């Protein structure tokens, strides 16, 4: 049980499915009686699905391309990135690559122990507020 730590939990996330969307419910610790504590609410009897993390860079590139398209030139993004994602990046050796990409996108922020999105507490995500110049009149 000693080897079950944050790095193992980050590499093997669990998620709850709500309306065709999956929301990660990160394990915080395993207790001596083998019960689990999570970083956010998990109701008794809820069905959790084992997830497989994918590469973060293509996902972040797609996210920022979409933001540019919708908002125009990004001036600053205030980012909240779950610390479990950081552990994942450290373990797979891509921390510098992702850090460089986020710097190029003018992201400033910090690592968190959970994020709020659409009124829901979630884990192992990147959330933020993007500030842009805006699009020319007539663009959506």
Which residues are covered by each model-predicted region?
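Small-residue-enriched flexible segments
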Residues: 1-105, 112-140
């Amino acid at each position: 049980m000693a080897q079950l730590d944050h790095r193992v939990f980050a590499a093997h996330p669990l998620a709850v499915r709500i309306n065709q969307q999956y929301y990660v419910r990160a394990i915080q610790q395993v207790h001596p009686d083998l019960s689990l504590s999570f970083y956010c609410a998990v109701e008794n009897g809820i069905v959790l699905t084992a997830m497989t993390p994918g590469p973060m860079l293509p996902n972040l590139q797609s996210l920022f391309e979409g933001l540019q398209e919708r908002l125009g030139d990004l001036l600053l993004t205030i980012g909240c990135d779950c610390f479990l994602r950081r552990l994942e990046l450290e373990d797979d050796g891509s921390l510098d690559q992702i850090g460089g990409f986020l710097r190029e996108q003018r992201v400033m922020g910090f690592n968190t122990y959970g994020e709020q999105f659409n009124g829901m507490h979630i884990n192992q995500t990147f959330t933020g507020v993007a500030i842009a110049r805006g699009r020319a009149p007539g663009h959506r």
